């Protein structure tokens, strides 16, 4: 009798599981909406996700799924909202429930939107390429299979420099999360001359700027004398004003001006450079002092050209971000497969040993002719896997 009860229990469990797996949801039948989009929580992201789904379902079928909130969900509805604990930031879970509803829950930030994009791509056959350039198959009936799909982006920030970036749908479709949006306005890379403009400070305080060939040289492409305590004090005053003008923003770039080998070579700076084995040592020491002065802010700096290699001794504090640049590398082969790339890889591996707060600015371009076609799809995955292995977050 006990064995019979166990057997019956197993059969009931298998029946329940099979019914869940086979559950389908029909959104549109014969050109008429049979489902609703239910906002579990009303907020800007969920509403944007719902509108995107409604828009493309209408493009496919000419039917409009109603968007509702503050109502009890029923069988066949799509539920947008709710927290998915196992998904990371911008992650999501698409899950068909036992009562034939599709739940789109989020790990945070834009997770619900990216869940809708995945639903449209993977289960409705929509491909989006550029502004108003997309493909889909018109259907009078849209039926979804049972779904269980969870994703979290491998990188916190994802950015491409593309003419399509001004299209909001393109940015959502390709899950682009612009780090630039996190920074205080106009304080995004090469900021030394914006924080302490040489036109304003250079004449009275040339000692703030790089000592090159026997004299301090203020200028748009000059750097700071980072061992001069007066430079730190002046930078703190400027930054304090900037932070007060942008109280809701926490991230700023304090980074070298564009140009190579323009760093300060005064005796004090030179001594630090030699001890640290790289001019980046002076930068990180300076940034760490700023990070201690403003512990609630995050400071980004460049590891670029002369500062690409990491320091031997000093380590960035947790609120100091390293933006590592591979500008000197060849790009027709993966970074690991050429000498210039291997020099960058050495720098990347060195930084990853002392920081887990690293961005990579990857120049997927041919500088010899920037407007000519430059096939690089075959190298992207290997490079991206290299970045992920070394704690890169963008």
Q: How does the language model describe each region?
A:
Residues 34, 42-52, 56, 85-285, ...:
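Feature activates predominantly on carbohydrate-active enzymes
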Residues 66-90:
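Short, well-ordered secondary-structure micro-motifs within conserved domains or adaptor modules
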Residues 300-331, 371-379:
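Substrate-binding cleft/loops of secretory-pathway carbohydrate-active enzymes
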Residues 311-317, 324-366, 383:
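Glycoside hydrolase catalytic-domain groove-lining segments
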Residues 369, 375-394:
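Substrate-binding cleft of secreted/luminal carbohydrate-active enzymes
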Residues 30-31, 72, 95-98, 246-247, ...:
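Extracellular/periplasmic catalytic domains that process cell-envelope and extracellular macromolecules
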